[in-house]
């Protein structure tokens, strides 16, 4: 456990926290593997002084748009299977606000899915969240454009686009003006993935509808159920009455990852960060390579494909994260009570043990150059930072990841995105491209497919924080680490004690953290 013991069946836990210095769209979700597919929701922080204080025109309405998955399989079993190298479970459909839309005929009747009713000329603030487990999505509305105004609860310079690219864990706030001819317009969410020879997985688009509120004659036309493939056009630009077939958008190709690369690269912060970045003081440098490896079920190194006992794992600098085998106290409480992690934790390597051509085509899994790399193993990866340290991390993707971009999420902090690129990171050339004026600020950053991203953050929130990939299969496979931020010089910059209603784990489940700590100290004497 990182921050707390699980909430047991038929039990409850009340969270108490302060919202300070944040506005915008966030979301909450479970952190038990697979469970967040259904246990999640929007968490919206509005300005203290109301919508009139937004740094953009006051919208007529605010609408959450949550993209997710529909599962017909046991999610707990899926998570267990992934730890056994079984990857056969996929979502049966995609959803917008919990509705699968008319691509799917689940009960013998096709339903139109989520409908956004709009009035001509009005402006709507869409609070878009990707709560899916596995896929980045492209979101488009036929005949309309978006103006992106925020990402991950941080305001951005207004950016006009006809497509939103959003990875698992990310949020995007976008203004939509109902300025098209009155009618019905499809809202389509299309998952993307890299093309062959990378691994192909089942992907399902879904759609809702933007419907103009107008007086029109009754319409008895049944909405046609049709399929969509990225890159096909569904009569975009056709203007008809509300009884005609709704207008569909021209979507990016399902194998297009470049549109996402440019979407994320065009985001800049509305608030300049020069006061933080002009000092050029970097206290900690990390170069983290994201990859895949193989271990035996017994923990030894195996050559992939040569044994039924080998297991594929996801890695950061060639080590795969694992929880301690018998944890009775979350790491957050251990940090507060100054309990040593010696013997249970390993420091996250600041650079990979071996440098190589990370984006070399032959490194595709099962390829001829795959195995000369360093052996992989599992450990509880931890990296400590002094309070107030300026930390720079470069995340480097590899060909081994089979074309996946990787949404890396850091709990408890925002990250300034300095630059991104394709191919291998170049320490000399790429530093010159850093945006040190107004880099976009996010809590989830998308490492491009076979590319890199450079971020900085200030370690000013004391505690124990999870850094992990927001693709569920990569997280379950071990693409994660723990960042520990030490106490600052004052009470306000130090970790507070665990709340009294926070129970311990295992056989000590009825003890408060303080009772458990005192009992442990007594047993040592």
Where are these regions (language model features)?
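Active-site pocket scaffolds in enzymes
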Residues: 1-3, 148-162, 168, 196-226, ...
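Acidic-aromatic/histidine active-site loop/patch
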Residues: 59-132, 232-234, 250, 266, ...
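Beta-strand cores of secreted/periplasmic/IMS beta-sandwich domains, seen most often
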Residues: 1-72, 111-143, 164-189, 272-294, ...
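Long, low-complexity intrinsically disordered regions
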Residues: 253, 259-265, 272-275
